Amino acid sequence: MGSPSACPYRVCIPWQGLLLTASLLTFWNLPNSAQTNIDVVPFNVAEGKEVLLVVHNESQNLYGYNWYKGERVHANYRIIGYVKNISQENAPGPAHNGRETIYPNGTLLIQNVTHNDAGIYTLHVIKENLVNEEVTRQFYVFSEPPKPSITSNNFNPVENKDIVVLTCQPETQNTTYLWWVNNQSLLVSPRLLLSTDNRTLVLLSATKNDIGPYECEIQNPVGASRSDPVTLNVRYESVQASSPDLSAGTAVSIMIGVLAGMALI
C-alpha cells in the first residue's frame, strides 16, 4: 500500500509552500472591509517578559495566517504561519527565533522579550478566496526600573547656612523622577529647587524642619521603584564658629553648578 502522503493523481506541493505562496500573491489583495482586529497585551512590555498579539477575526472562511516583523509582507521577514485543517499547522519562517508561538486563531505569543523585539508587526490573513487582509500593530519594550539611591553633597548641613544637593541615582532614559519627604509628595517652598528632569533636589538653606526622611522614586512605562530613605543631620553652629562647612565662595560655586537647568517648585 502506498504512502498516505503520496499524491498519485496530482502534483504534490508542500503545505508550507502553499502558505507562503498564498501570502505573497499580493495581486489578490483586492479592497475589502477589514474583519480582523489585534489587541497588544501589554502595549508597553517589560524586558524579559512576554507579549500577546491577540487576533480577533469575524471571518470563518480562512486559509491561514502569516506574521511578519515590520510593515512589509516579505518572505525574509516572515516569523511564523499557521494553516487551518492541516496536521502540521505551524510554519516557522526566517525571522523566527524560537521564542514565538502562533495559536489557531492567529494570536502571536512572544516570550522573553528583548529590546530588539520592539516595533511593528504585520499579520497577513489568508482567506480561502485569496482575498487577503493585512493588519499592523506595534509595541514598545522597556527595562524595569532599578532600585534608586540618593546621593548628596552634604548629609550634615549647618542650619540656615549650608546648601544641600540631593540627587536620585541612576540617570536613565524614559524615566520620571519623584521625591517624597516624610512619606509625602514634595511641597512647594521658596527654599527648594528642582532640576528640569526632577532628578536633583536643592535645599537653599537647610533647617531643622528639613531633616526628612527623603526618598526618590523612578517610574517608567513598565514599573516603579523607590529608594531607601535618607535623613539629614542638620546641625546648629554658633556665630563664633571659625570653620563653617561651606565658605561663601563654595556656596556660590555649588549654586552655579546646580541651578543650570533648575526650576523653582
Curated annotation (Swiss-Prot):
Its placement in the membrane is given as:
Lipid-anchor; GPI-anchor
Which sites carry lipid of kind GPI-anchor amidated serine?
S242
Q: Name one GO biological process term.
A: regulation of immune system process
Primary localisation category: membrane
Where do the record's glycosylation annotations fall on this chain? N57, N85, N105, N112, N174, N183, N198
Give the Ig-like V-type domain ranges.
36-142
Which cysteine pairs make disulfide bonds?
Answer: C168-C216
- Give all residue intervals belonging to the Ig-like C2-type domain: 146-233
Tissue expression pattern: Expressed in columnar epithelial cells of the colon (at protein level). Strongly down-regulated in colonic adenocarcinomas.
What's in the GO CC field?
apical plasma membrane; cell surface; cytosol; extracellular region; plasma membrane; side of membrane
Annotated family: Belongs to the immunoglobulin superfamily. CEA family.
Looking up PANTHER family in the UniProt record yields: CARCINOEMBRYONIC ANTIGEN-RELATED CELL ADHESION MOLECULE 19, CARCINOEMBRYONIC ANTIGEN-RELATED CELL ADHESION MOLECULE 7
Q: Could you identify this protein by its name?
A: Cell adhesion molecule CEACAM7
Q: What is the phylogenetic placement of the source species in the record?
A: Eukaryota, Metazoa, Chordata, Craniata, Vertebrata
Gene responsible for this protein: CEACAM7
